């Protein structure tokens, strides 16, 4: 092992502290940018699915505290009247790394499996674990899903994508309300069935979804750039450390 004199070791340590400190600062800037961009996404979705795209639309009180005012021509309905709900019959051990179909479990990661039990448009929600009521997926095609994942499908009066964006953004209020009373470690069927949704006319839903898709696409592109900058900064930091401790650059 190469071991420079103690004076040189101290000089290298001081050099690395300065250089790495600046790089870490730049990384923190990018991480904060990503946090702000994710907050912006949530704000865009919230405003679009509860207020619509017309800022001059007449508003009325929804009667639901966490929804607030909505355009007066929108409807308010509970989820039980908007879709069918069922759970899967598979466990995580059924996954196959090279499986033919998506396998929705209780985490943001989509696994693979060689079977499918559903073919169509659906919104999947984690029913328990750390992702309970917080992990959602939109699917349209053949897939399988975990026994503690809710499959919301056969949508009525609401498009699948509008439903997805709404519940992705708003179901957290149900979780927070439950957490204020006790620990929420699972989502019960009645919590989904009794969940209130705003329902614009179908044509308006389509315009809202198109708007959200476009805005999120632009934001995700910025997030990807920020993540790439973080990768490059970490690579630069590692390169500087390697060169300094192997004597490839002179620091004193």
Regions found by a protein language model. Give the residues of each.
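A short glycine-rich beta-alpha junction/loop motif
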Residues: 1-10, 143-150, 180-206
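Amphipathic alpha-helical coiled-coil/heptad-repeat segments
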Residues: 4-57, 198-252
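Non-catalytic DNA-recognition/assembly elements of restriction-modification systems
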Residues: 6, 10, 62-90, 94-105, ...
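Positions in alpha-helical segments
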Residues: 21, 62-65, 147-150, 190-194, ...
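Residue-level recognition of specific faces of alpha-helices
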Residues: 36, 66, 183-186, 191, ...
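Non-catalytic, well-ordered alpha-helical scaffold segments
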Residues: 42, 98, 160-164
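Short Ser/Thr-interspersed hydrophobic loop/turn segments at strand-loop and sheet-helix junctions
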Residues: 79-91, 101-112, 116-134, 140-149, ...
């Amino acid at each position: 092992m190469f071991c420079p004199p103690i004076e040189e070791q101290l000089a290298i340590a001081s050099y690395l502290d300065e250089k790495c400190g600046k790089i870490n600062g730049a990384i923190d800037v990018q991480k904060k940018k990503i946090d702000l961009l994710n907050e912006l996404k949530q704000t865009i979705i919230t405003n679009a699915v509860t207020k619509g795209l017309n800022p001059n639309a007449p508003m009325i009180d929804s009667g639901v505290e966490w929804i607030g005012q909505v355009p007066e021509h929108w409807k308010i309905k509970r989820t039980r009247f908007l879709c069918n709900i069922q759970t899967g019959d598979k466990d995580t051990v059924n996954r196959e790394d090279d499986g033919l179909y998506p396998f929705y479990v209780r985490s943001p990661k989509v696994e693979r499996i060689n079977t499918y039990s559903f073919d169509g448009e659906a919104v999947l929600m984690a029913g328990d674990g750390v992702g309970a009521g917080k992990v959602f997926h939109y699917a349209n095609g053949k897939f399988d899903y975990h026994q503690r994942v809710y499959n919301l499908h056969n949508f009525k009066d609401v498009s699948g994508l509008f439903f997805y964006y709404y519940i992705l953004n708003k179901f957290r209020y149900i979780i927070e309300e439950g957490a204020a009373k006790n620990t929420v470690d699972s989502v019960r069927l009645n919590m989904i069935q009794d969940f209130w949704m705003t329902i614009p006319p179908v044509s308006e839903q389509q315009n809202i979804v198109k708007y959200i898709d476009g805005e999120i696409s632009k934001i995700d592109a910025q997030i990807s750039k920020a993540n790439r900058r973080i990768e490059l900064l970490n690579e630069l930091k590692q390169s500087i450390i390697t060169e300094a401790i192997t004597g490839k650059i002179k620091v004193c």
